[in-house]
């Protein structure tokens, strides 16, 4: 952690909805004139898409694991080094993993490839990370200790799988069977490297549907905001001072389910993020 060069990380699995949280932060940054250095966690993947497909197929034949959730498929040491350097000096590096044709056009690179490393822009107010491992802790790596504000985005597991399958079908052209196989191959690393992070976060945002999602592998319909609630658990009340009474007034239809948890209609999730996180971010910057 660093008062001079604060780091904010949004962490969540594939299909969790971290991009929605990112959009909320981008709005806060623009509205308050904050200049962030931005890092997409996919840039720390160890291999490009073709190489990953080839090596993961080989690993499967050998009975070993290679996934984007675990250490074999990522540069965890590089991730921690970047966070450490930014916290000390306000500098670091990043690159881009090219997911689709739009990104390919923007970065003049083929889909599924990794661009070259480039230095972060200078004189930024904070570092913002969005990805899979913003709160990672292993026997050798401790990313979480460098983070000043750690946000978890973790819908209930059936909904997460539904969103993952839907995205892979729409963007990557996978079949439901392909996407399901990928989920299964990642399960060990999901349990050991993804879910433990949510016990270290300052806030967790968990989307909960109110319709039947019992079999996520048999439906392509994603529950709408009107069919969902978001559970906001403030895990660190010492760091994040929340006026829950004010939130209940501002967020129509919300309820308190426990002394540190508020449940809001899913359509108000981004607004809730803005109400809760704006003063926290301002405090981080005021302490610089």
What are the roles of these predicted feature ranges?
Residues 2-8, 124:
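Pre-Walker A (Motif I) flank of P-loop NTPase domains
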Residues 12-13:
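P-loop (Walker A) phosphate-binding loop of NTP-binding proteins
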Residues 16-17:
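Conserved glycine(s) of the Walker
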Residues 20-21, 25:
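Hydrophobic positions on the alpha1 helix immediately C-terminal to the Walker A/P-loop
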Residues 34-40, 44-103:
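Conserved nucleotide-sensing/catalytic segment adjacent to the nucleotide-binding pocket
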Residues 113-122, 143, 157-288:
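C-terminal accessory "lid"/substrate-recognition subdomains
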Residues 136-141:
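Conserved ATPase-coupling elements of RecA-like P-loop NTPase cores
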């Amino acid at each position: 952690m660093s008062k001079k060069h604060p780091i904010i990380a949004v962490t969540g699995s594939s299909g969790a909805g971290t991009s929605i949280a990112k959009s909320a932060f981008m709005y806060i940054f623009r509205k308050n004139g904050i200049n962030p250095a931005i890092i997409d966690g996919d840039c720390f993947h160890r291999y490009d898409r073709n190489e990953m497909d080839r090596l993961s197929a080989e690993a499967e034949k050998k009975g070993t694991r290679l996934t984007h959730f675990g250490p074999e498929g990522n540069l965890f040491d590089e991730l921690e080094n970047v966070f450490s350097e930014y916290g000390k000096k306000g500098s670091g590096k990043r690159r881009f993993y090219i997911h689709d044709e739009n990104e390919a056009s923007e970065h003049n690179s083929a889909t599924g490839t990794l661009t070259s490393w480039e230095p972060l822009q200078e004189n930024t107010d904070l570092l913002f990370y969005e990805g899979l491992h913003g709160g990672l802790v292993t026997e050798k790596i401790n990313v979480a200790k460098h983070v000043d504000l750690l946000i978890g985005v973790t819908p209930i597991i059936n909904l997460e799988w539904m969103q993952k399958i839907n995205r892979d079908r729409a963007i990557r052209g996978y079949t439901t069977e392909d996407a399901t196989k990928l989920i299964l191959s990642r399960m060990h690393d999901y349990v050991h490297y993804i879910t433990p992070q949510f016990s270290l976060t300052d806030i967790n945002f968990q989307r909960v549907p109110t319709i039947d999602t019992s079999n996520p592998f048999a439906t392509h319909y994603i529950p709408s905001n009107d069919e969902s609630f978001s559970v906001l658990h403030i895990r660190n009340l010492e760091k994040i001072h929340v006026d829950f009474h004010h939130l209940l007034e501002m967020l129509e239809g919300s309820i308190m389910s426990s002394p540190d948890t508020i449940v809001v209609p899913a359509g108000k999730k981004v607004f809730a993020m803005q109400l809760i996180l704006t003063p926290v971010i301002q405090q981080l910057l005021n302490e610089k």
